[in-house]
């Protein structure tokens, strides 16, 4: 770690080194002990997982790429694949779409069982705002931004900003198509 460039004003290099070490211990616990069934991307993986994060997958199919940061109290309750360079704020939830079968006459919801859960995909360079809810089975494209409090029920196009309930297109992340293409090419080069 480059302590020279990662030290905040007023914080000593020693405190930054101690925080970095504590972060590595917490991440080791979360990645190797608490969620040992999750595939964490590889040898050079930098993943930040607070202790308050909860991961449960119906088919134990969770993959997390490199440079992924979960905010406090994030909930993952579906099969999912995370790309690389993802930021998630606090209270982000990935929830199952077909958790309970509700349309069988003569059976209670309790006795009807569960439906098939679809896999969710989160691309590279994605930012998901505070309290967003992502319904299982959607694909969030590379470079997308999901606004705080959004409920994402449909796929999110690459390099777009969505928000609301249900989430709708707000605007493009980049002003021109050339900028968008340049960024997507950069991501393809960075994460082949």
Question: Over which residues does each language-model region extend?
Answer:
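Terminal amphipathic alpha-helical/low-complexity segments used for targeting or macromolecular assembly
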Residues: 1-37, 42, 85, 99-105, ...
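Conserved short histidine dyad/triad with adjacent acidic residue
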Residues: 48
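Flexible, glycine/small-residue-enriched loop-and-beta-strand segment within the central core
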Residues: 53-64, 69-136, 173-174
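Short conserved AdoMet
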Residues: 87, 139, 157
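Flexible glycine-rich beta->alpha loop in the catalytic core of nucleotide-sugar glycosyltransferases
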Residues: 99-100, 150-151, 157
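Beta-rich strand-turn-strand
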Residues: 130-145, 150-154
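Conserved functional loop/turn residues at catalytic and ligand-binding sites
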Residues: 154-155, 166
């Amino acid at each position: 770690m480059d302590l020279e460039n990662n030290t905040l004003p007023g914080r000593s290099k020693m405190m930054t080194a101690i925080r970095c070490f504590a972060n590595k211990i917490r991440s080791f616990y979360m990645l190797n002990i608490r969620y040992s069934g999750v595939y964490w991307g590889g040898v050079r993986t930098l993943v930040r997982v607070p202790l308050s994060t909860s991961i449960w997958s119906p088919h134990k199919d969770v993959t997390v790429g490199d440079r992924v940061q979960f905010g406090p109290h994030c909930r993952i309750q579906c099969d999912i694949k995370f790309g690389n360079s993802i930021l998630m704020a606090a209270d982000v939830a990935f929830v199952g779409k077909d958790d309970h079968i509700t349309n069988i006459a003569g059976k209670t919801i309790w006795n009807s069982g569960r439906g098939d859960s679809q896999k969710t995909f989160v691309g590279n360079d994605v930012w998901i705002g505070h309290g967003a809810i992502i319904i299982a089975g959607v694909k969030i494209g590379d470079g997308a931004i999901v606004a705080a409090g959004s409920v994402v029920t449909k796929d999110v196009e690459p390099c777009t900003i969505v928000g609301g309930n249900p989430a709708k297109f707000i605007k493009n992340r980049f002003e021109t198509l050339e900028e968008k293409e340049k960024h997507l090419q950069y991501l393809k080069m960075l994460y082949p």
